[in-house]
Curated annotation (Swiss-Prot):
GO terms for cellular component: cytoplasm; cytosol; nuclear membrane; nuclear speck. The active site is at residues 331, 378. The modification Phosphoserine is found at residues 236, 417, 511, 582, 887, 978, 987, 1199-1200. It catalyses: a 1,2-diacyl-sn-glycero-3-phospho-(1D-myo-inositol-4,5-bisphosphate) + H2O = 1D-myo-inositol 1,4,5-trisphosphate + a 1,2-diacyl-sn-glycerol + H(+); a 1,2-diacyl-sn-glycero-3-phospho-(1D-myo-inositol) + H2O = 1D-myo-inositol 1-phosphate + a 1,2-diacyl-sn-glycerol + H(+). Palmitoylated. Palmitoylation at Cys-17 by ZDHHC21 regulates the signaling activity of PLCB1 and the function of the endothelial barrier. Palmitoylation by ZDHHC21 is stimulated by inflammation. Its EC number is 3.1.4.11. This is 1-phosphatidylinositol 4,5-bisphosphate phosphodiesterase beta-1. Keywords: Calcium, Cytoplasm, Hydrolase, Lipid degradation, Lipid metabolism, Lipoprotein, Membrane, Nucleus, Palmitate, Phosphoprotein, Transducer. The modification Phosphothreonine is found at residue 509. It is an enzyme of class 3 (hydrolase). The lineage of its organism: Eukaryota, Metazoa, Chordata, Craniata, Vertebrata. Residues 540-656 form the PI-PLC Y-box domain. Its cofactor is Ca(2+). A lipid is attached at residue 17 (S-palmitoyl cysteine).
Length: 1216
């Protein structure tokens, strides 16, 4: 497969994550360069990380789009106030040094026009945290490649942040955001029951995300999506089932170039997860159904991006030699405008490196100030000068902020002062420190035949490309000096002297920037001032190792020298000349060595050549003017947007392998490279312009010369509609893309007058097929918030027309044979020969063996086979004819072959079905319900016992009080007894009263005990009735659930069976194809004419055999399916038969329980009574009857742990 990879890439990109401190906001002081006024603000970031916004003391909110942020700097790298008064204002009353609390946020629409947001934090830690977080958000690759839905959410967030001081959303902001058609906006607002006057405002709570979505649907209706939705099965019903959605994703959205083992099609469970994520109606989602609204959300969601996130991530092998990569390279990096006049800028080095460039150019000249500081400028022009030291500091600051891979510094050294060159070398050593690669790596010595180290080996390293000082004899040096002076007339190549030994650093005049064609005036103009370089001093020469510039002489000489550390630069005209004359040799040269291409000197406007020209030859450092955002620069940005924006892209395999030769001008398919076929249909656009204008779309393809098609397609211009134009035109088809790994598709949108709106550049290899939104970018490759195109893309491996019939016959032989039979019947009326054959076929007296004799091929004449019939044999003849060579003759063998691919499929048993997750989940739920029911009844029992205990205590207290009173009276009476006048009848009366009191107390306790016993019986009966009812319901639900589970599992098994059948057919074809190949191999040993005869016969017989075998296999598969379906019915019936059995068992169980219950309660109370009697006899003189009833029943209900320890089958759960 074209898209197959050795392994599945594990995505390393992190989604946007905004920290709490950024969401809550922090106090800062904002200051301006040109003002002494400072403004206290509260700085925040929205939860999605779209905007950076702040509120001042007047409650006014300002926004900064994080997609415009280039860098965030703090401490010594941040801007510091120059005005002493301003500095004093900022430093008042704050903790920590002012320099450590400074933050500068750099933002702008491009690399040249940048602005600064200057802030001061109140604490150093806060400054560091905000700097790191803001930079992380601004450079997040997933945020730069958001889904369509995320961009619409960004627009919504912008509206929610730009509110009035009262917290309301001004409608003028909505009109301004969707300004293309005011009337449409007004109608859409009214449809949402919102005010529509431009001067109105609405409360934030009235403009919810749901209302916003309805507003968008009214503003930009999408009938084309309704049509797609209907086309895929939602014609009679307002939804797609999970199976229909699965077919849509696997058949339309999946890349057919991917390996099916490493990247299998989505399964039903995975599609169900997607439906649950995007379907707003939960009841539909649970049924596995998705509405048109959910379908629209899926199409605009993160899973349906036009480019896979894996391609954005660092997914290429970074361990190959440096020469195997394209390297993002800049020309005259310091310039901000044209080549002849304008400003040079240190900031350009920062911006270029932050954008992903890995090779920058430094034009160094002698400083003419008293300090003798070297400068960087464009020599002999009106461009300004900048400090060399400041440039080195800027490079050190930003070298590895966005990519860890090596930086290449391309020095164009015109400094003829040894002292200043020494300063340059010293600055490089001191400022770069350990990052500067001073010595070659041990594994990669500077020797012939040794490849360059890899980007992985050189991570976080800076390499210098500069002339290397020679260590030859003084005579040689003298000659070289003369030559060097003469070389001032050269323009961009190297010296005429060639090193005499293979040692490193032998060519101080072997500049990559001297032109060997020095007498050619035009060439000199093309190549600029690079040839006037000064001699390298010892100090600068010592910095050079793996990138040693030499004069290019020929590809043959370079091959003989075989020095990977030597490289040459070519002005674009010279590079084009070499590419035209020796394309294959140029590709070979670039496999081992580096080459750098740069714009010709006549491009004074800083325009660019097309980099694709030189990528096609494998040139690594194709240097462009980054300050000019023309089409060439846009293609360059599109190229290096992928592989983690690392600045390195691995070249196609054929441009790396030493055993393969590649011609960039090839027009045919290259053996070993799978070409692609790409089809693009532009369906519609959304919010393309903020004006009411017509729009159109253009499609280009860039790649090898054979693949490149400029303005290959252009749609019609929509009539005054930029909100939702629909084109629905025929797709543009790129039939054969020879080298897809180096081809890119550009889709651009323009207003009717030709004004550029936006575009997108997509590598062919990374494009996902299917229905997708393409969110547009501006010229600087920054994402636009609202403009998008909706397209349908088909991409697949290319099949030549000549093989289309063979591919069709092999992939679907039955349909192919049926088609051949149909054609035979259509031709039968035109040929007498065919009529005779039909008559013979109808003749009952003809023997089967005679029929095929007429169709046998005659001996070959001059290598061409002749047969008696031009059409395939009718099926009746094919069935009765004798087996052709290579066919399976014996039926037993046929059955053996079929049995070898036929898989045994067993139906799931009831026990296996009961282990299904949904059934087990329901069982657990029922178990919990029964536990809760028992707990409730235990609580009622406890409450009842508490109530009776209280009543008992009251009776006992009353009894004790009355008894105490009587006993007190008895004591008094006893005293009186001692007096002679006291009557005896008083004491007898008191005894009677005490006896009566005891009798009354005993009766009350007996009554209370009887009442307690009855109430306990009632409670337990109530519990049993509840349990019985609940278990009866549980049986119904479990039987129903088991039935549903059985149906679902059986349906899935039948679906799986279809997949198994297809695999079995493929396996059968594979085995038969193996036999066919063996026979073809055998036939190769014979003479050519005989071999051709047998090969033709083999193909014919092979197709017939495959048809017969597949028919037999299908019969066997059909019997297997019938048997499985029968077994499924049997299992479902067994499940239904379980229900009455379980219900009878339940009835019997509770009849027994009810019978035993009164006796159990009585025994229980009596047992408790005995225990309590013995207890009370030791502690109290009161009658113990009531206390006995509170024995065993008056205990806490069992805990959930205790209940879980019980047998659920016996206590709470149903027998099922």
């Amino acid at each position: 497969m074209a898209g197959a990879q050795p392994g599945v890439h594990a995505l390393q990109l992190k989604p946007v994550c905004v920290s709490d401190s950024l969401k809550k906001g922090t106090k800062f002081v904002k200051w301006e360069d040109d003002s002494t006024v400072v403004t206290p603000i509260i700085l925040r970031t929205d939860p999605q990380g779209f905007f950076f916004y702040w509120t001042d003391q007047n409650k006014e909110t300002e926004l900064l789009d994080l997609s415009l942020v280039k860098d965030a700097r703090c401490g010594k790298h941040a801007k510091a106030p120059k005005d002493p008064k301003l500095r004093e204002l900022l430093d008042v009353g704050n903790i920590g040094r002012l320099e450590h609390r400074m933050i500068t946020v750099v933002y702008g629409p491009d690399l040249v026009n940048i602005s600064h947001l200057n802030l001061v934090a109140f604490q150093e830690e806060v400054a560091k945290e905000w700097t790191n977080e803001v930079f992380s958000l601004a450079t997040n690759l997933l945020a730069q490649n958001m889904s369509r839905d995320a961009f619409l959410e960004k627009a919504y967030t912008k509206l929610k942040l730009q509110v009035t001081p009262e917290g309301r959303i001004p409608l003028k902001n909505i009109y301004r955001l969707f300004s293309a058609d005011r009337k449409r906006v007004e109608t859409a607002l009214e449809a949402c029951s919102l005010p529509s006057s431009r001067n109105d405002s609405i409360p934030q709570e009235d403009f919810t995300p749901e209302v916003y979505r309805v507003f968008l649907n009214n503003l930009c209706p999408r009938p084309e999506i309704d049509n797609i939705f209907s086309e895929f099965g939602a014609k009679s019903k307002p939804y797609l089932t999970v199976d229909q959605m699965m077919d849509f994703i696997n058949l339309k959205q999946r890349d057919p170039r991917l390996n099916e083992i490493l990247y299998p099609p989505l399964k039903q469970e995975q599609v169900q997860v997607l439906i649950e994520k995007y379907e707003p109606n939960n009841s539909l989602a649970k049924k596995g159904q998705i509405s048109v609204d959910g379908f629209m959300r899926y199409l605009s969601g993160e899973e349906n991006g036009v480019v896979s996130p894996e391609k954005l991530d660092l997914n290429e092998d970074m361990s190959q030699p440096l020469s195997h990569y394209f390297i993002n390279s800049s020309h005259n990096t310091y310039l901000t405008a044209g080549q002849l006049a304008g400003n040079s800028s240190v900031e350009m080095y920062r911006q270029v490196l932050l954008s992903g460039c890995r090779c920058v150019e430094l034009d160094c000249w002698k400083g003419r100030t008293a300090e003798e500081e070297p400068v960087i400028t464009h020599g002999f022009t009106m461009t300004t000068e900048i400090s060399f030291k400041e440039v080195i500091e800027a490079i050190a600051e930003c070298a590895f902020k966005t990519s860890p891979f090596p930086i290449l510094l391309s020095f164009e050294n015109h400094v003829d002062s040894p002292k200043q060159q020494a300063k340059m070398a010293e600055y490089c050593r001191l400022i770069f420190g350990d990052a500067l690669l001073m010595e070659p790596l041990d594994k990669y010595p500077l020797e012939s035949g040794v490849p360059l180290p890899s980007p992985m080996d050189l991570m976080y390293k800076i390499l210098v490309k500069n002339k290397k000082k020679s260590h030859k004899s003084s005579e040689g040096s003298g000659k070289k000096k003369l030559s060097e002076q003469a070389s001032n007339t050269y323009s961009d190549s190297s010296s005429v002297f060639e090193p005499s030994s293979p040692g490193a650093g032998e060519a101080d005049t072997e500049s990559d920037d001297d032109d060997d064609d020095d007498d050619c005036k035009k060439s000199s103009m093309d190549e600029g001032t690079a040839g006037s370089e000064a001699m390298a001093t010892e100090e600068m020469s010592n910095l050079v190792n793996y990138i040693q510039p030499v004069k290019f002489e020929s590809f043959e000489i370079s091959k003989k020298r075989n020095r990977s550390f030597e490289m040459s630069s070519f002005v674009e005209t010279k590079g084009l000349e070499q590419l035209t004359k020796s394309p294959v040799e140029f590709v070979e040269y670039n496999k081992m060595q580096l080459s750098r291409i740069y714009p010709k000197g006549t491009r004074v406007d800083s325009s660019n050549y097309m980099p694709q020209l030189f990528w096609n030859a494998g040139c690594q450092m194709v240097a462009l003017n980054f300050q000019t955002v023309d089409l060439a620069m846009q293609i360059n940005m599109g190229m290096y947007e992928y592989n983690g924006k690392s600045g390195y892209r691995l070249k196609p395999e054929f441009m790396r392998r030493p055993d393969k030769h590649f011609d960039p001008f090839t027009e045919g398919i290259v053996d070993g490279i799978v070409a692609n076929t790409l089809s693009v249909k532009i369906i519609s656009g959304q919010f393309l312009s903020d004006k009411k204008v017509g729009t159109y779309v253009e499609v280009d393809m860039f790649g090898l010369p054979v693949d490149t098609r400029r303005k290959a397609f252009k749609t019609k211009t929509s009539q005054g509609n930029a909100v939702n134009p629909i084109w629905e035109e025929e797709p543009i088809v790129f039939k054969k893309v020879v080298l897809p790994s180096l081809a890119c598709l550009r889709i651009a949108v323009y207003e009717e007058g030709g004004k550029f709106i936006g575009h997108r550049i997509l590598p062919v290899q990374a494009i996902r097929p299917g229905y997708h939104y393409i969110c547009l970018r501006n010229e600087r490759n920054q994402p636009l918030m609202l403009p998008a195109l909706f397209v349908y893309i088909e991409v697949k491996d290319y099949v030549p027309d000549t093989y289309a019939d063979v591919i069709e016959a092999l992939s679907n032989p039955i349909r192919y044979v049926n088609l051949m039979e149909q054609r035979a019947k259509q031709l039968a009326a035109l040929t007498l020969e065919d009529e005779e054959e039909v008559k013979k076929e109808a003749d009952p007296g003809e023997t089967p063996s005679e029929a095929p004799s007429e169709a046998r091929p005659t001996p070959a004449e001059n290598g061409v086979n002749h047969t008696t019939s031009l059409t395939p044999k009718p099926p009746s003849q094919a069935l009765h004819s004798q087996p052709a060579p290579g066919s399976v003759k014996a039926p037993a063998k046929t059955e053996d072959l079929i049995q070898s691919v036929l898989t045994e499929v067993e139906a799931q048993t009831i026990e296996e079905l009961k282990q299904q997750k949904s059934f087990v989940k329901l069982q657990k739920k029922h178990y919990k319900e029964m536990k809760d029911l028992v707990k409730r009844h235990h609580k009622k029992t406890t409450d009842l016992i508490k109530e009776h205990t209280t009543k008992y205590n009251e009776i006992q207290n009353d009894y004790l009080r009355r008894r105490a009173a009587l006993e007190k009276t008895a004591k008094k009476d006893n005293k009186k007894k001692s007096e002679p006048s006291s009557p005896d009848h008083v004491s007898s009366t008191i005894e009677q009263d005490l006896a009566a009191l005891d009798a009354e107390m005993t009766q009350k306790l007996v009554d209370l005990k009887d009442k307690q016993q009855q109430q306990l019986l009632n409670l337990r009966q109530e519990q049993y009735y509840s349990e019985k009812y609940q278990k009866r319901e549980h049986i119904k639900l479990l039987i129903q659930k088991l039935t549903d589970v059985a149906e679902e599992c059986q349906n899935n098994q039948l679906k799986k069976l279809k997949e198994i059948c297809e695999k079995e057919k493929k396996e059968l074809k594979k085995k038969m194809d193996k036999k066919r190949q063996e026979k073809i191999t055998e036939a190769k040993s014979k003479d050519k004419s005989q071999m051709e005869e047998e090969k033709t016969e083999m193909i014919r017989s092979y197709i017939q055999e495959v048809v017969q075998y597949i028919k037999r296999l299908e019969e066997a598969q059909s019997k297997r399916q019938e048997k499985l379906v029968e077994k499924h019915k049997e299992i479902r019936q067994q499940i239904l038969d379980e229900k009455p059995k379980l219900q009878v068992e339940l009835e019997q169980e509770y009849q027994d329980k009810f019978k035993r219950l009164p006796l159990e309660i009585l025994e229980f109370v009596q047992e408790a009574m005995k225990g309590k009697i013995s207890e009370d006899s030791n502690h109290s003189s009161a009658p113990p009857l009531m206390t006995s009833d509170s024995g065993k029943l008056n205990q806490k209900p069992p805990s959930s742990e205790e209940l879980e320890g019980e047998n659920p089958g016996k206590e709470f759960d149903t027998p099922l």
